[in-house]
Amino acid sequence: MGKEKKTESYNNDSGSYNYRMFKFYNRKFKINEVTPTDDVRDAFCQFAVGGGGGGTDGDSSDGDGSTGVMGAEQLCSFLDDHGESTTVAEAQRLIDEVIRRRHHVTRFTRHGLDLDDFFNFLFYDDLNPPITPHVHQDMTAPLSHYFIYTGHNSYLTGNQLSSDCSEVPVIKALQRGVRVIELDLWPNSTGTDINVLHGRTLTTPVPLMKCLKSIRDYAFSSSPYPVIITLEDHLTPDLQAKVAEMATQIFGQMLYYPESDSLLEFPSPASLLHRIIISTKPPKEYLESRNPIVKQKDNNVSPSSEDETPRTEEIQTLESMLFDQDFESKSDSDQEDEEASEDQKPAYKRLITIHAGKPKGTVKEEMKVVVDKVRRLSLSEQELDRTCSSNSQDVVRFTQRNLLRIYPKGTRFNSSNYKPLIGWTHGAQMIAFNMQGYGKSLWLMHGMFRANGGCGYVKKPNFLMKKGFHDEVFDPRKKLPVKETLKVKVYMGDGWRMDFSHTHFDAYSPPDFYTKMFIVGVPADNAKKKTKIIEDNWYPIWDEEFSFPLTVPELALLRIEVREYDMSEKDDFGGQTCLPVAELRPGIRSVPLYDKKGEKMKSVRLLMRFIFE
């Protein structure tokens, strides 16, 4: 695919593109000059000196902004008017940066922004981003008060059945800001070491040592807040002890040790800066789970599974690999071996900060809040759906103190993902996603965790943590009054001409772009809108405004997608993004777009305005 040379200016000299029609005929399309919109021009005129609005010196000359200049004080006033508290020095830094990019000169030869400079400033997404780019939420509450960026089978490079296992996806996830890494631990072929792989499949293993070293090296490459390693271990006590030894040696001071076997309350992200914590089932619970027949007789319940295949199959495989080798009969010597292994378990058990489990009885029973300890419970997406339909209040109450992890259903062999909002709206902290399962659900995940500076922890709204006089809690299905209305104006887009060849979207003419917008949140807030199609233009100017009434804006996401209209085939993809509504910065903003994998596109941006009423 050919690339056009990128220019940093959005006010380019006019040119043209030639498209070959039939065999001998060339069709020429003029490239229109990109100019400031009326709203941009009005904003400049209002604040610039000599811009017609008076600026700070009362000059109100021609009113079109063409001769005005916006200095540091005027830019500071503009930013203050947009709800941003800034200093004159910071405003001057922004002016200097715009002038450097556009004119390659210093402020000693240019002292302020003209209209085109101001227009370009608004279109630079690093200088004028749509959401707050730094951590701004309280990070001192217990972990259960946060949505946490969570991966599922973090070591897989592709599908759930036959892809390679590798440390590379773990590294990529950490670099993106994921804070919960899942590793499935199995004995190697000789039973003397530990591999990471998706059991009972054709996935190729990767040594645990590689994964742990990668976590150590990249854990805090994008965020200083704690990394949680969830272990699904299928190991003998001897190998569990080896895991403890590996983790201790590799992580060193990074590894967090809980002060007691059971916590009354989880520690806070702020108290765990640059720490790695472990979450798994305690060894005793694991040993019991390896002989579910006995447990079933005792409890008259069937075990549940977090894995993608039935639990009975897992048990059969585990028994053939481990149980039959070491615990086939209960002779005296076997009992002695088990007692000897107790000497090794404490080292492994001591690592576990977040005790995990799966429902042994009904989910309703498992979700009863225990006063003297906190824990993590794992449910499949189907179990969550059923539980939220019948006992949604129990889910919200449980997640006020405990951690709830949701994982994909077993039929998602292609590593696709589910809709995350049902979990978030019920307070579930760990919505475990396949980070290689590209698509709209993963775009929502990316969007949620752009919040709070992209640190991987997003504070849950206060209403999810409160109880009423009669122990009632938030119900996402309850119809509530509109709290505020979000008005979104889509001015224009640019950057495709720089990132794509001129025939990428259409071999015979420039592209026909349109923008779709979706609100995804509680059921009452879900909505979608679409702009008109702008034909044959690399610089689409829509200049359309849409209103979204919101009952629970704190849990709403704004998903944006640009498509290129195709009369005969499926419309082409032109970029996407997803933004947390609660994080949107009011005013005119530059909104960068991302590709289907969630990677930021080099040049493609939209100019938009957000207003809350």
Swiss-Prot record:
Entry keywords, A to Z: Cell membrane, Hydrolase, Lipid degradation, Lipid metabolism, Membrane, Transducer
Expressed in which tissues: Expressed in leaves, flowers and siliques, but not in roots.
Span of domain PI-PLC Y-box: 349-465
Cofactor (UniProt): Ca(2+)
Entry annotation: catalytic residues: 152, 198
Protein's GO biological process: intracellular signal transduction; lipid catabolic process
Disordered, as annotated region: 288-349
Catalyzed reactions: a 1,2-diacyl-sn-glycero-3-phospho-(1D-myo-inositol-4,5-bisphosphate) + H2O = 1D-myo-inositol 1,4,5-trisphosphate + a 1,2-diacyl-sn-glycerol + H(+)
Gene Ontology molecular-function annotations: phosphatidylinositol-4,5-bisphosphate phospholipase C activity
Species in which this protein is naturally found: Arabidopsis thaliana (Mouse-ear cress)
Enzyme Commission code: 3.1.4.11
UniProt name for this protein: Phosphoinositide phospholipase C 6
